[in-house]
Amino acid sequence: GNIQKEPIAIIGMGCRYPGGVRTPEEFWHLLSSGEDILSDIPNDRWDFEAHFDPEITVPGKMYVRKGYYLDDIDQFDPQFFGLSPREAESLDPQQRLVMEVSWETLENAGIAPSSLKGGKTGVFVGQYWDDYSSQRIYSTDNREIDRYAQLSALRGLTAGRICHLLDSHGPAIQLDTACSSSSLAVHLACLSLRNGESDLALAGGVSLVLAPEHLIGICQMNALSPDGRCKTFDASADGFGQGEGCLLYTSDAA
């Protein structure tokens, strides 16, 4: 048959979304409730008032104060994943999230991660921002840059960390195609399953906004909605709302 038409089954899902959503069931409840979980930019991200001005045209400032942000992004158990506290401190929180959610999507699929050792599990991750490295690594005292800092600053290692965690011998593909990164990751995972490169695939993406510079830049483009909300296909649309999250699917050939 046509290999490009072979069906793919999504057998597991793990996620983190704003509003305290940590499971697929909580995500479904949020969608079905129609609740708006818009919130202020968390106080622990940066000095908000120093970077804010409600006037859209002010150089070097952001004009938005709200968006869709995750809670407790500093919470992580490094020992569970065999990491030292020093390495975990250097690790981009986006990589931490992907490690947690990859484990959870396998549990959701009823797969013991240890059973994948040596197998052809492919990992495909879309990741765009690199705020953590620019904020914590490249702007710090050079004497603080060690082997952990350098490795943890590389976006290209997120997928590889998961393959290392699972001892997988499948593809480890990291993608940055801006807004399409996650959808392309899923597309490539499907191709890998159909081509026989992977017996199982973890695919999705992660996004956290950890520094103000990118938001300032997007505001200077006048691309963000002043009230922080998306109004897709609506006459009142005036930009997009900045959001955060992490989603990974576990898929195999049906």
Where in this protein do the model-derived segments appear?
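Catalytic cores of large soluble enzymes that bind and process phosphate-bearing ligands
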Residues: 19-23, 62, 83-98, 146-154, ...
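Structural motif
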Residues: 7-9, 121-124, 171-173, 199-201, ...
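4′-phosphopantetheine-dependent carrier domains
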Residues: 1-6, 13-15, 22, 26, ...
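Flexible, low-complexity linker/loop segments at domain and module junctions
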Residues: 1-11, 113-119, 143, 240-246
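Active-site-proximal gating segment of KS-fold condensing enzymes and close homologs
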Residues: 58-59, 66, 74, 85-93, ...
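A glycine-rich phosphate-binding loop feature that marks nucleotide/adenosyl-phosphate handling sites
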Residues: 46-49, 119-126, 178-181, 205-208
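Glycine-/small-residue-rich "gating" segment that lines the acyl/pantetheine channel
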Residues: 40-43, 140-149, 156-163, 184-191, ...
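ACP-dependent fatty acid/polyketide chain-elongation machinery
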Residues: 1-87, 95, 103-107, 221-222, ...
